[in-house]
């Protein structure tokens, strides 16, 4: 009976969010995104872009950030329950730009991050070195975003051993039903002060790679059409953060390959998929710029990547 407490318009919005289309979408081989600068007064040479494509349809936002003028940080919620909204973290830290970070286990007490999480030289969670699919154990070195002590950044396939972080130049060669073995002799010590696992990696040397199978994301919602968050960097070190709305009439969301194409449009050398779905949120100067699952409300998450003015 509680259903009738809601108005017809609210019910209609709910239906549109849950059932935006009966037609199965296919992966686009190219997306002609119309990008334009919508904010250039953020400070420290940061630019916010808005993009749309009515044919897919898609709506997305990207922020271009030069690190010589800005400090980049990985943040962890300090709330009692271990999660905060992106806007709450922006307000606490005075961040000029902040985006949601990695995956986490919702409903656990205490809440736990899925894989590597390191902030201010403190290791909150080691890497998840293995996952199970159909009762088969796969060793993993999933994509991670790392920040060095000099404020430069890197994206690599990473894992941990005895609380030390190691990185590889390529992912383990996992395939469905065919797990790979782990080889630390091919890795190197990753001396980063902050790092966060998410994945999969989308771009490497500007090439679309989308290592979802190797990182063992097969048979998960990660590989489907979703609202998305991503982070990458250009050859000159400038960072690009992006969110793509999804599950809406005006924006269906994107496949991982499509997200890689959008990041490449900003000349990213390397790019990483972050936690998506209803977690995708981008806040600029304290304002939420996107519409998570069609609503101007935010899901609480555990980790974030933020830009703090120097």
Where are these regions (language model features)?
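Zymogen propeptides
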Residues: 23-160
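A short catalytic or substrate-binding loop motif that flags glycine-/basic-rich loops and adjacent residues
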Residues: 54-57, 136-139, 194, 221-225, ...
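Conserved, well-ordered active-site substructure
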Residues: 108-133, 213-270, 279-310
